[in-house]
Swiss-Prot record:
The lineage of its organism: Archaea, Methanobacteriati, Methanobacteriota, Methanomada group, Methanococci. Keywords: Cobalamin biosynthesis, Cobalt, Lyase, Metal-binding, Methanogenesis, Nickel. It comes from Methanocaldococcus jannaschii (strain ATCC 43067 / DSM 2661 / JAL-1 / JCM 10045 / NBRC 100440) (Methanococcus jannaschii). This is Sirohydrochlorin cobaltochelatase. The active site is at H9. Catalyzes the insertion of Co(2+) into sirohydrochlorin as part of the anaerobic pathway to cobalamin biosynthesis. Involved in the biosynthesis of the unique nickel-containing tetrapyrrole coenzyme F430, the prosthetic group of methyl-coenzyme M reductase (MCR), which plays a key role in methanogenesis and anaerobic methane oxidation. Catalyzes the insertion of Ni(2+) into sirohydrochlorin to yield Ni-sirohydrochlorin. Substrate binds at E45, L70, A71, H72, G73, I74, H75. Pathway: Cofactor biosynthesis; adenosylcobalamin biosynthesis; cob(II)yrinate a,c-diamide from sirohydrochlorin (anaerobic route): step 1/10.
Length: 143
């Protein structure tokens, strides 16, 4: 069985999670994936490991993870793949950048055990899609 996990940044304010919940509901309504979960990078739950675990508990063997970010950044290229167990978790990054940021990542050390028979497919972020251009133009015209 296939699952889709939408991954967002998370925020101290509720809007980020509410948006992801709404998007997940809209995706569910299309009936393309039997399981749709959301996971948040930081500040709120469900965390990314919690979302993946929830999908596995429902019988998912193939988990497609879509980062709901416009562009690649440190979260999509490093933090999320690390949380998904796709890249080695070495702790040298704590020295890479000033520590004012990384104390927010209270989810970072949550360990995710992926069973042997479960495949994780990590996809690209939203990107410079023409459909985004349409939305930008609508917003510019106050629509």
């Amino acid at each position: 069985m296939e699952a889709l996990v939408l991954v967002g940044h998370g925020s101290r304010l509720p809007y980020s999670k509410e948006l992801l919940v709404k998007l997940a509901e809209k995706v569910k309504e299309r009936n393309l994936f039997p399981i749709v979960e959301i996971g948040l990078m930081e500040f709120s739950e469900p965390t990314i490991p919690q979302a993946v675990k929830k999908a596995i508990e429902q019988g998912a063997k193939r988990i497609i993870v879509v980062p709901v970010f416009l562009a690649h950044g440190i979260h999509t290229t490093r933090d999320i793949p690390r949380l998904l167990g796709l890249i080695e978790d070495n702790h040298e990054h704590h020295h890479e950048h000033s520590h004012h940021h990384h104390h927010h990542h209270h989810h970072e050390h949550e360990k995710l055990e992926i069973p042997e028979d479960v495949e994780i497919i990590y996809r690209e972020p939203i990107g410079a899609d023409d459909r985004i251009v349409d939305i930008i133009i609508d917003r510019a015209f106050g629509r």
